[in-house]
């Protein structure tokens, strides 16, 4: 019953107030970026994802918020495009495979190199450690330390440990993005 009332309130609010936000999703290949987009768009997880070639754009509506998501390929040849797609967005979402400890250093370096770009100064960053359902996956505290997130001082930064497969913490991730979008516009 409460869910029905909540949906009705969201629908009623959407008649008078719509919010749009744009974000860019980046991270090394095989971290789960496209899977994340599919899970928030449709609630569906698929094991059969293929790597993104270049970029994909998808619009997802949650309540009265429409999120335009740029999903950028993570292979080395596409990383030079990251900055271009991150300019002017409401938030940058940086995805990490939290279970692949061998790639953490490369992931940290790519994140810090990206955020050092003057054109991206001040854009908030949401760091997501995906695949928390796998053995030996780093938790939030370990991600913050290994990714040296405390060194990032010029912007809002948040970190969550998620699992697209199990849909763990997907809701809190969306809440952060939507809340941040609302607070940035007020």
Swiss-Prot record:
Reactions catalysed: GTP + H2O = GDP + phosphate + H(+)
GO BP: any one term: plasma membrane repair
Binding site for GTP: 29-35, 71-75, 130-133
Gene3D superfamilies (UniProt xref): P-loop containing nucleotide triphosphate hydrolases
CDD domains according to UniProt: Arl10_like (cd04159)
InterPro entries: Arl8a/8b (IPR044154), P-loop_NTPase (IPR027417), Small_GTP-bd (IPR005225), Small_GTPase_ARF/SAR (IPR006689)
PROSITE patterns referenced in this protein's UniProt entry, alphabetically: ARF
Post-translational modification: Ubiquitinated at Lys-141 by RNF167, leading to its degradation.
Family membership noted in the UniProt record: Belongs to the small GTPase superfamily. Arf family.
Name of the protein: ADP-ribosylation factor-like protein 8B
Organism encoding this protein: Macaca fascicularis (Crab-eating macaque)
Gene name as annotated: ARL8B
